[in-house]
């Protein structure tokens, strides 16, 4: 390396496909259209509804309503191995700051009014994920006199995550399904 060589690194080309020598996704029509629009105008044109839906799916704030052993798996989801925040979701302590409530565990008759009260404190649009057999339908304690046979009898549920207890991967998949549902249905009421 002499004094005449530049000290600037060459521009990154991304991941190179060994078969073609081109960057991966270079011939993808979706990204091609976006690149063409950005290079032509310098900005993208979209509807406000698509922008709001994109922002909602990428910044879901969830609050835990952990009632039993499923709450431990919910904590695993936030830990470094699974790192739920890379999908744009982060835990919040207050229902007034959250979009999603994850109900995990056995819901009893005494706890049902508290669940409804917390749900009512959440701002619209609000979503509920029912996590585990106990939250879905009473689970192992289904026939007990004090157990609500599914949290969907108290609050409307958007996504059901099965299992006893469900794994952290199952909860992540449920969260991704919720993001897909939000993208599909939108959030603006007309």
Curated annotation (Swiss-Prot):
<comment type="function">
    <text>NDH-1 shuttles electrons from NADH, via FMN and iron-sulfur (Fe-S) centers, to quinones in the respiratory chain. Couples the redox reaction to proton translocation (for every two electrons transferred, four hydrogen ions are translocated across the cytoplasmic membrane), and thus conserves the redox energy in a proton gradient.</text>
</comment>
<dbReference type="GO" id="GO:0051539">
    <property type="term" value="F:4 iron, 4 sulfur cluster binding"/>
</dbReference>
<keyword id="KW-0813">Transport</keyword>
<dbReference type="GO" id="GO:0050136">
    <property type="term" value="F:NADH:ubiquinone reductase (non-electrogenic) activity"/>
</dbReference>
<dbReference type="GO" id="GO:0005506">
    <property type="term" value="F:iron ion binding"/>
</dbReference>
<dbReference type="GO" id="GO:0008137">
    <property type="term" value="F:NADH dehydrogenase (ubiquinone) activity"/>
</dbReference>
<keyword id="KW-0830">Ubiquinone</keyword>
<keyword id="KW-0411">Iron-sulfur</keyword>
<protein>
    <recommendedName>
        <fullName>NADH-quinone oxidoreductase subunit B</fullName>
        <ecNumber>7.1.1.-</ecNumber>
    </recommendedName>
</protein>
<dbReference type="InterPro" id="IPR006137">
    <property type="entry name" value="NADH_UbQ_OxRdtase-like_20kDa"/>
</dbReference>
<keyword id="KW-0479">Metal-binding</keyword>
<keyword id="KW-0408">Iron</keyword>
<feature type="binding site">
    <location>
        <position position="70"/>
    </location>
    <ligand>
        <name>[4Fe-4S] cluster</name>
    </ligand>
</feature>
<dbReference type="GO" id="GO:0009060">
    <property type="term" value="P:aerobic respiration"/>
</dbReference>
<keyword id="KW-0472">Membrane</keyword>
<dbReference type="GO" id="GO:0005886">
    <property type="term" value="C:plasma membrane"/>
</dbReference>
<keyword id="KW-1003">Cell membrane</keyword>
<comment type="similarity">
    <text>Belongs to the complex I 20 kDa subunit family.</text>
</comment>
<dbReference type="GO" id="GO:0015990">
    <property type="term" value="P:electron transport coupled proton transport"/>
</dbReference>
<keyword id="KW-0004">4Fe-4S</keyword>
<feature type="binding site">
    <location>
        <position position="134"/>
    </location>
    <ligand>
        <name>[4Fe-4S] cluster</name>
    </ligand>
</feature>
<dbReference type="Pfam" id="PF01058">
    <property type="entry name" value="Oxidored_q6"/>
</dbReference>
<keyword id="KW-1278">Translocase</keyword>
<keyword id="KW-0874">Quinone</keyword>
<feature type="binding site">
    <location>
        <position position="69"/>
    </location>
    <ligand>
        <name>[4Fe-4S] cluster</name>
    </ligand>
</feature>
<comment type="subunit">
    <text>NDH-1 is composed of 14 different subunits. Subunits NuoB, C, D, E, F, and G constitute the peripheral sector of the complex.</text>
</comment>
<dbReference type="GO" id="GO:0048038">
    <property type="term" value="F:quinone binding"/>
</dbReference>
<dbReference type="GO" id="GO:0045271">
    <property type="term" value="C:respiratory chain complex I"/>
</dbReference>
<keyword id="KW-0520">NAD</keyword>
<keyword id="KW-0997">Cell inner membrane</keyword>
<dbReference type="InterPro" id="IPR006138">
    <property type="entry name" value="NADH_UQ_OxRdtase_20Kd_su"/>
</dbReference>
<feature type="binding site">
    <location>
        <position position="164"/>
    </location>
    <ligand>
        <name>[4Fe-4S] cluster</name>
    </ligand>
</feature>
